Curated annotation (Swiss-Prot):
GO terms for molecular function: DNA binding. The keyword Nuclease does not apply. The gene is seqA. It holds the Pfam family SeqA_N. This is Negative modulator of initiation of replication. SUPFAM superfamilies: Replication modulator SeqA, C-terminal DNA-binding domain (SSF82808), Ribbon-helix-helix (SSF47598). GO terms for cellular component: cytoplasm. It is found in: Cytoplasm. It comes from the Bacteria. It comes from Vibrio atlanticus (strain LGP32) (Vibrio splendidus (strain Mel32)). Negative regulator of replication initiation, which contributes to regulation of DNA replication and ensures that replication initiation occurs exactly once per chromosome per cell cycle. Binds to pairs of hemimethylated GATC sequences in the oriC region, thus preventing assembly of replication proteins and re-initiation at newly replicated origins. Repression is relieved when the region becomes fully methylated. Homodimer. Polymerizes to form helical filaments. Keywords: Cytoplasm, DNA replication inhibitor, DNA-binding. GO terms for biological process: negative regulation of DNA-templated DNA replication initiation; regulation of DNA-templated transcription.
C-alpha cells in the first residue's frame, strides 16, 4: 500500500464519490478510473520515494457545489414547494446537504442529543438507542436519521448540522424556517 498526499478539494471529491460505508480510496479511484484489478500488469517497484505528492496543477478539476446556491435553489424549487409534510422537507434538506459536501456532512452527523443519537450509518444503531426512533434512510446518502421527533427538533437538528458545515446563520434560518 502506497501513501499519497492530495489537496483538500481533491480529497473531498474522492470522499464524495463513496458509494458504500467502508469503501477504500483505492476502490473509489479504481471505479472512477474504470480500472479492473484483474487486468493490471505488475510494474517494477522503485523503492526510493516514500510517497507521491499530487498537486492541483495536474489539471483535474473536481465537481464543486456552491452550497449556498444549492440550498437557495432547493428552497425555491417546485419539488420542495410541493412537499406538504415537514418530514419530507426535512429528508430533502438532509439529502441536499449530503450532496453538497459529503465529507462535512459526515463529520457534522456526529450531532447527538442528551439521550439520543440522531444520525448513524445504519438503522440498527438508531434502533439500539430506542425502539420508537422510526429511523429513515437519507436519500442518496449512506446515512440514517431518527424521525419520530417534532418539527421543532427536526429544525434544531438541521440548524446544528448546517452550523457544523459552516453555512451562514441567515441561510440556516431560512432553511430551518422552511421545514
Amino acid at each position: 500500500m502506497k501513501t499519497i498526499e492530495v489537496d483538500e478539494d481533491l480529497y473531498r471529491f474522492i470522499a464524495g464519490q463513496t458509494e458504500r460505508i467502508g469503501e477504500s480510496a483505492s476502490d473509489i479511484l479504481r471505479r472512477l478510473l474504470l480500472v479492473d484489478n484483474q487486468g493490471t500488469v505488475p510494474i517494477e517497484e522503485i523503492v526510493e520515494p516514500k510517497g507521491i505528492v499530487v498537486s492541483k496543477e495536474v489539471g483535474f478539476t473536481p465537481e464543486k457545489f456552491d452550497g449556498v446556491k444549492e440550498m437557495r435553489s432547493l428552497l425555491i424549487s417546485d419539488e420542495f414547494a410541493s412537499l406538504k409534510k415537514a418530514i419530507d422537507r426535512f429528508m430533502l434538506v438532509l439529502s441536499t446537504l449530503h450532496k453538497i459536501d459529503p465529507l462535512s456532512f459526515s463529520e457534522a452527523t456526529q450531532v447527538k442529543g442528551r439521550k439520543r443519537v440522531y444520525f448513524a450509518d445504519n438503522e440498527a444503531t438508531l434502533l439500539a438507542n430506542g425502539n420508537t426512533t422510526k429511523p429513515k434512510a437519507i436519500p442518496q446518502s449512506p446515512f440514517w436519521v431518527i424521525t419520530n421527533n417534532n418539527t421543532s427538533r427536526k429544525r434544531q437538528m438541521v440548524e446544528q448540522l448546517m452550523s457544523r458545515m459552516n453555512f451562514q446563520a441567515e441561510l440556516i434560518e431560512k432553511v430551518t424556517g422552511s421545514i
